[in-house]
C-alpha cells in the first residue's frame, strides 16, 4: 500500500524541521567557540575605572566577541598573576615598570590615567610640603603610583624621601586616613572620593597633585608581549570595548555615576559627583601610553637598570594606533 501524499509531506516536514534544529545547534556551538575568554582585573574600587565597569555592565565585551572575567585584584598581585599566565590583561600602575626592569616580558597597551590624579592631605597645623620635614607621609604600597607621586613632590620641595620625610605604607586610602587619625602619620595621599572623607575628618589639602599635571602611569592596561602577539585580536576587541566604555563615561554622566556608586558601594550624591568630575578629564578618547609618563616612573625606580632603560621598552601602543587608523574612535563619537 502506497503512503498517502499527506503522509509524505508530513514526513518531509519532520525531516526538514530536524535538519533545521541540527543546523541551529551546530551554528550556536560554532559561535560559542568563537567567543574568546579573557581574564582581567580592575585595581581599586575607584571611579577611575568606570570605563572598565561600564564595558562589563553594558555587555560591551560580549558585543565585541569576548567573554571577560573582570574582577578586583590589587595591582601587585595582578602583576604576578600576569607573569604566571593566570591573567591576560591587567590594570596596574608602576608595577609593570618594576617587572620589566626585572626582565619580565610585560608592556602597557593603553592608558587609564596618564598623570597623577590625587591630592596630599595633612593635619591642619601643616602649612606646606616643607613643613613635612621630620614628619611621616602615608602612601599605599611600595612602587604604587602614590609612592612615586610622593617621591616626585618631596624632591620638588627639596626634601629627601626616607631621610627628611618618612614614608610609611598602609595599603589603602581608608587605612591611610585611619593612620592619620590615630597619629601614625601626619599626612597622606588620597584619591577621590576618599579626598572628601579626608576633608570631613578635618584634614587640609596640602597639594592638589592633579593640578601639577605630572606625567605618570597612575593606572593603565597591560599584558605580556606574547599575549599581544599570539592573541592580538582578543586584545584588540578588549580595547574596543574599553574605548566604548570611555565614550559612555564621557557622555553619559548620570549613568556613569550610577555605575561608580554600584562598584564603590556609595550612594552619597556629593561623593559620586566629586568622583565623576575628578576623573572625567583623565578619560581620553584615545588613551595612548606616553613615554614621558613611563620615564617619570623610571626616574624614581630603585632598580639599577632604571637609569639606562628606555621608556618605549615598556610600551606597545600599536593596537590602539591600528584601532584609531580604522576610524573606530571617530565613529564612536559621531
What residue spans do the PLM features occupy?
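Secondary-structure end/capping motifs
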Residues: 229-309
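N-terminal secretory signal peptides that target proteins for export/translocation
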Residues: 1-9
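Sec/Tat signal peptide C-region and signal peptidase I cleavage site
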Residues: 26-32
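Short, glycine-/small- and polar/acidic-enriched structural segments
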Residues: 32-182, 186-192, 205-209, 214-215
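Ligand-binding clefts/hinges and TM-proximal coupling segments of bilobed small-molecule sensing domains
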Residues: 20, 145-163, 241-272, 315-318, ...
Amino acid at each position: 500500500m502506497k503512503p498517502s501524499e499527506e503522509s509524505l509531506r508530513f514526513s518531509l516536514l519532520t525531516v526538514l524541521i530536524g535538519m533545521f534544529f541540527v543546523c541551529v545547534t551546530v551554528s550556536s556551538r560554532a559561535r560559542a567557540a568563537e567567543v574568546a575568554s579573557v581574564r582581567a582585573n580592575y585595581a581599586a574600587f575607584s571611579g577611575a575605572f568606570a570605563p572598565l565597569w561600564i564595558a562589563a555592565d553594558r555587555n560591551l565585551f560580549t558585543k565585541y566577541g569576548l567573554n571577560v572575567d573582570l574582577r578586583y585584584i590589587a595591582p601587585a598581585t595582578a602583576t604576578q598573576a600576569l607573569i604566571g599566565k593566570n591573567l591576560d590583561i591587567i590594570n596596574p600602575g608602576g608595577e609593570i615598570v618594576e617587572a620589566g626592569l626585572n626582565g619580565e616580558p610585560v608592556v602597557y597597551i593603553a592608558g587609564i590615567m596618564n598623570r597623577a590624579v590625587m591630592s596630599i592631605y595633612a593635619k591642619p597645623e601643616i602649612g606646606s610640603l616643607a613643613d613635612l620635614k621630620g614628619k611621616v607621609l602615608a602612601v599605599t604600597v611600595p612602587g604604587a603610583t602614590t609612592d612615586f607621586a610622593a617621591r616626585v613632590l618631596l624632591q620638588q620641595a627639596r626634601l629627601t624621601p626616607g631621610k627628611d620625610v618618612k614614608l610609611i605604607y598602609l595599603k589603602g586610602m581608608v587605612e591611610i586616613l585611619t593612620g592619620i587619625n590615630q597619629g601614625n602619620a601626619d599626612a597622606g595621599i588620597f584619591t577621590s572620593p576618599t579626598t572628601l572623607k579626608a576633608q570631613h575628618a578635618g584634614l587640609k589639602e596640602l597639594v592638589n597633585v592633579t593640578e601639577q599635571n605630572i606625567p605618570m602611569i597612575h593606572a593603565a592596561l597591560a599584558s605580556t608581549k606574547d599575549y599581544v602577539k599570539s592573541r592580538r585580536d582578543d586584545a584588540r576587541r578588549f580595547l574596543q570595548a574599553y574605548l566604548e566604555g570611555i565614550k559612555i563615561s564621557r557622555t553619559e554622566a548620570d549613568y556613569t555615576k550610577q555605575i561608580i556608586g554600584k562598584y564603590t558601594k556609595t550612594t552619597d550624591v556629593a561623593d559620586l559627583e566629586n568622583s565623576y568630575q575628578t576623573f572625567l578629564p583623565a578619560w581620553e578618547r584615545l588613551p595612548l601610553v606616553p613615554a614621558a609618563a613611563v620615564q617619570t616612573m623610571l626616574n624614581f625606580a630603585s632598580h639599577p637598570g632604571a637609569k639606562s632603560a628606555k621608556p618605549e621598552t615598556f610600551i606597545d601602543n600599536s593596537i590602539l594606533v591600528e584601532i584609531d587608523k580604522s576610524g573606530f574612535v571617530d565613529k564612536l563619537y559621531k
